[in-house]
């Protein structure tokens, strides 16, 4: 895959602009939500594959895609479908679906994934958690794709069943048995993080992520990185997926530099760091 030459500056946007940009892509550029989700999810699958290939062997990898209730979860459903085929088909892929989707678009993406043969683990009960643990133990290397919350999450208490999900992921990451072989790949925003991370303080040590939050090994930003990506610790892999920006939108949001990253790129993602 071709990748853009490394650029020194990566623009970011706050949560309110991320929401408006999504609306503009639909209302001004006439994308459908299904088109955005399909392209974003495919980009997530490609970037995840690249990350796995750079850190392990695909044939030895197990991938668990954790899908939330909103568009981020829909992106995860698309990503899981693509990760289960093509160059990733030798890996073992599962989807953890803590709760059935309520939106019509996510229901359609779920139906497509089921017809494609994607294997699901549903609910957050003891049986589901046991199935997840068995899956992890069967994998030589384990990758968790965090597609739970996107830029609409503004921090604060997490409601059931996703509080159980986040606590489970935190336990995985810190477990003596599972942690060393676990890598977390977050989609757009690490779940549980405030999109703008304002409460962390702009002048604090950015390596000090508050306790009780996920520490992703890789982040796949979509369209334009969000402000919270500035708090990624050194060494975190950072990808950009979804080449949706038009020149006019790039100017309107003052993120023209993003378009330079896509110059000469044929894949649906680029490596930022």
UniProtKB/Swiss-Prot annotation:
Cofactors demanded by this protein: K(+)
GO MF annotation terms: metal ion binding; NAD(P)HX epimerase activity; nucleotide binding
Enzyme class label: isomerase
Highest taxon, organism lineage: Eukaryota
Substrates-to-products reaction catalysed: (6R)-NADHX = (6S)-NADHX; (6R)-NADPHX = (6S)-NADPHX
InterPro entries found in the cross-reference section: YjeF_N_dom (IPR004443), YjeF_N_dom_sf (IPR036652), YJEFN_prot_NAXE-like (IPR032976)
Sites where the protein binds (6S)-NADPHX: 71-75, 150-157, 162, 188
Residues that coordinate or bind K(+): 72, 146, 191
Pfam family, one: YjeF_N
PROSITE patterns xref list: YJEF_N
Alphabetic keyword roster: Isomerase, Metal-binding, NAD, NADP, Nucleotide-binding, Potassium
Alphabetized NCBIfam families for the sequence: yjeF_nterm
Name of this chain's protein: NAD(P)H-hydrate epimerase
Species for this entry: Giardia intestinalis (strain ATCC 50803 / WB clone C6)
